[in-house]
Amino acid sequence: MNNDNEVTNLRDVLKEGKICLCPVKGIINVLSKKWTLLIIVVIGNHGTIRFNKIMKQFEAINPKILTDRLKELEKENLVIRKAFAEVPLRVEYSLSNDGKELIDAIIPLMEWATKKDAKK
């Protein structure tokens, strides 16, 4: 949304109840958890990536938190988990088609946040 008219129109549509916010609430509950958006971006940037490589992208993430977030993203069909029958077990993560669509929606948010942070 690049102009004020589009923002006003969206507000009017929301006020009139023409858009159900129920699906939005569900995805917001998942995406608002700490690390989730960043995990999606890291997977999107790499295409296919293993757990330990995701861990290395973040300084302070707990392995259990990363595991939980990846399971939630898989449950929401945003991430695909592929396990290989090898010893040791090898697991790779990639974005599903829905996850790739979500990246397209996240990019403007990240650009906005970067621009806002640069003003500080």
How would you name each of these model-derived features?
Residues M1-L31:
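N-terminal leader segment of winged-helix/HTH proteins
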Residues E101-D117:
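Short, solvent-exposed amphipathic helices
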Residues N52-F84, P88:
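Canonical helix-turn-helix DNA-binding module
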Residues L21-I65, E92:
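N-terminal helix-turn-helix DNA-binding core of bacterial DNA-binding proteins
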Residues M1-L10, Q57-D68, K119:
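Membrane-interacting alpha-helical segments
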Residues A85-I106:
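Basic, amphipathic "hinge/linker" alpha-helix immediately C-terminal to the N-terminal HTH DNA-binding motif
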